[in-house]
Amino acid sequence: MSHSDQTSPLEARKSAALSGTARVPGDKSISHRALILGALAVGETRISGLLEGQDVIDTGKAMRALGARVERTGEFAWTVRGVGVAGFAQPEAPLDFGNSGTGCRLAMGAVAGSPITATFDGDASLRSRPMRRIVDPLEQMGARVIQSHEGGRLPLTLQGARDPLPITYRTPVPSAQIKSAVLLAGLSAPGVTTVIEAEASRDHTELMLQHFGATLVTEPEGAHGRKISLTGQPELRGARVVVPADPSSAAFPMVAALLVPGSDIVLTEVMTNPLRTGLITTLREMGGAIEESETRDDTGEPMAQFRIRGSRLRGVEVPPERAPSMIDEYLVLAVAAAFAEGTTVMRGLHELRVKESDRLEATADMLRVNGVKVEIVGDDLIVEGKGHVPGGGLVATHMDHRIAMSALVMGLAADRPVKVDDTAFIATSFPDFVPMMRRLGGELA
C-alpha cells in the first residue's frame, strides 16, 4: 500500500495570537480532475498550483499507468500529455489509489468508458469504503465488475465498455463523485448523458469539462437540484489549469484564527466556488470576523483573499441542504461549535459515515475526550458550546487526516493540550499543515 505503518503522534497547546499570511495547498478536487481530464485530452495540459499531497500523487501515478505522460516541471507545476477520450492503455498492474476516494472513483468513471480492464486498490481505509453506488451507473453504461471484495469494495476489477451507452441517471445521494464518474464515462458514449441530482453537489467536474472543450448544459431541477447534460465523444483539448487554494484545507487555519484570541491572519487565493463555501457562511453566522477581498477568476474557478480575526462565536443551526457545500468541513466546524456560546445543531450528516472513517462518530469522540458535551441524534450532530474547551484528551485519528487536523486546531485554544495518536495521514491533503501552523504562531510539538 501507499502509506507506511509508522505513526507520528503530536500535541497542540494553547497558543498566543496567530498572525501572518499563508497560502494553503492547491484544491484537492481540482488537482485530481486536472490530472484525469489532462489524461483524457489530446495535447498538453499545464497545471500550476497542483496539490502535491499523497492522494493527488497517487492519481497522477494511475494516469501514467493508463498511458498518459505525467511530469513534474517545477514546484506545484505539472504537465500531462493525454491519450484522448477512450484512449487509455491496459495497465500492467493494479492501480493503487492509497487513501484517495476521489481519485479512485473518478478514475473508475474514466476507465468505464475505455475498452480496457483495470484493477482498483487502495489502503485499508479506502478498502473499507463503499464503491457499489459508483459502479451501479457505470454498469448501466456497459462497464462490468469482474471481481470485487465483499459488498463491492476494493480491490475491484472493472472492465470498461467497448461501446458505452449514454444514460439518464438520478443520483441516490448528493455526491460529486457519483456525478463525476458518470460524466467521465459519458465522454466516451455517443449522444447525451444526463445526471439529475436532487441537491446540487460540487460542480468542479462540469466547469473543468467545459474548460477542456466539452459541450455541457446545466439546468435547475426542483428546489435545490440540478440536471447536467453532457454531449458525448468530444475531442478534449489540453488546457492551462490554475489550481486555487483548497477551501477545505483553508478551514483549519481559518477556524484556528477565530478561536485563538487576538489572532489576525490572511489566507490568499482561496477558492470561493459557491458550492464550497458553506463553512465560511456558517462561521460568519456564528459571529466570525472573516473579510473577503481581491476576488478573481482563473480557469473557471473563483478565488479570493480572506482576513480572519479572533472572534467570540455563538451556537447556530446548520440546515441539511448546506451539507454538500461543506461535507469535509463539519469536523473543524464541530471544533468551532465547541468553543462557541450556546448549542450548535448540524443536520443531515449521513455522508460523514462513509468517509475515510465514520466521521460522525469520530467527531463526537474527539470532542468527548476533550470535555465537550456532544450528542448524535440520527444523522444530526449536536454540540453544546461553553465558550471554552477543557482539552487534555488523546484523539484517535482512525487514519483520517481531517480528524487529526481538527483535533490539533482544538488544542491551540483549549485549556489543556490536545494530543493526536497519528499525524502521518495529514500528508494526503495538507503536507505543509504543521509547519504552516507553526509559522502562524501555533504551539505544535
Swiss-Prot record:
InterPro entries: Enolpyruvate_Tfrase_dom, Enolpyruvate_Tfrase_sf, EPSP_synthase, EPSP_synthase_CS, RNA3'P_cycl/enolpyr_Trfase_a/b. Phosphoenolpyruvate binds at K28, G101, R129, Q177, R359, R402. It is found in: Cytoplasm. GO terms for biological process: amino acid biosynthetic process; aromatic amino acid family biosynthetic process; chorismate biosynthetic process. Its EC number is 2.5.1.19. The active site is at D328 (proton acceptor). One of its GO terms (molecular function) is 3-phosphoshikimate 1-carboxyvinyltransferase activity. 3-phosphoshikimate binds at K28, S29, R33, S175, Q177, D328, K355. It comes from the Bacteria. Keywords: Amino-acid biosynthesis, Aromatic amino acid biosynthesis, Cytoplasm, Transferase. One of its GO terms (cellular component) is cytoplasm. Pathway: Metabolic intermediate biosynthesis; chorismate biosynthesis; chorismate from D-erythrose 4-phosphate and phosphoenolpyruvate: step 6/7. It is an enzyme of class 2 (transferase). The keyword Amino-acid biosynthesis applies. It catalyses: 3-phosphoshikimate + phosphoenolpyruvate = 5-O-(1-carboxyvinyl)-3-phosphoshikimate + phosphate. Residues 1-25 are annotated as: Disordered. PROSITE patterns: EPSP_SYNTHASE_1 (PS00104), EPSP_SYNTHASE_2 (PS00885). Pfam families: EPSP_synthase. Catalyzes the transfer of the enolpyruvyl moiety of phosphoenolpyruvate (PEP) to the 5-hydroxyl of shikimate-3-phosphate (S3P) to produce enolpyruvyl shikimate-3-phosphate and inorganic phosphate. Monomer. Belongs to the EPSP synthase family. PANTHER family: AROM/DEHYDROQUINATE SYNTHASE, PENTAFUNCTIONAL AROM POLYPEPTIDE. This is 3-phosphoshikimate 1-carboxyvinyltransferase. It comes from Rhodopseudomonas palustris (strain BisB5). The lineage of its organism: Bacteria, Pseudomonadati, Pseudomonadota, Alphaproteobacteria, Hyphomicrobiales.
